Amino acid sequence: GGINLNGITEKVDAIIPVHIYGNPCNFDSVKSFAEEQKIPIIEDACQAHGAIYKNKKVGSLSEVGCFSFYPTKNMTVGGDGGMTTTDNEETAQKIKSIRDNGRKTKNEFDRLGFTMRLNTVNAAIGRVQLRHLDGKNSRRREIVSIYRKNLSDDCILPENKDGKSVYHQIVLKHEKRDEIRKELTNNDIGSAIYYEKLIHQQPVYEEYGYKLPNSEKFSREVLSLPSYPLLT
């Protein structure tokens, strides 16, 4: 897939590149295009805690980065949660306001907002999890090296040559994906498909009739293999 240049209009508020499966995207090309079009970037690093692109941690490559702490992620908070990072003070204040119902001061609300405050117990769990993040990510990299050594045809999705993936998912791509998954199931080996139904195929968007053949082909051929740090 790629960015449709003809689809860029004044209605576009931001470009959101995704570091999918924990693998950094080709951020320089996104940044170059965004700067040319004067469009801000919001990084989706929800699957990429600790991933690196050109010696910088993802989530810090643009003004705003977003992380998820959902229980299946490389780092969690003992429940659902998330984090937004920014190096811009004005943006930081807006985010703090929006997460607290649009609050400006104790008794003033100057924008619409939401209740998205992370409680202190979840935050404390997250701080402990953070200490172990690098070690767990290293274990994921050990696991993928074993897969690569034992699987043929380079079927594991490649790592960005300018980055360091944290392998939130270890994903193979193969035309016979469904046959492979059936064989794994028959041998009591778990697997998963992300994402079987793409955004433009969801009922909420299907009326627009988008056709994205590259994304659709990719979706038909990818399969996530077991990849958690305690895998033996």
PLM regions with names:
Residues 1-77, 83-85:
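Active-site phosphate-binding strand-loop segment of PLP-dependent enzymes
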Residues 2-7, 14-18, 23, 27-29, ...:
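PLP-dependent aminotransferase class I/II
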Residues 79-80, 127:
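Amphipathic alpha-helical segments within well-ordered protein domains
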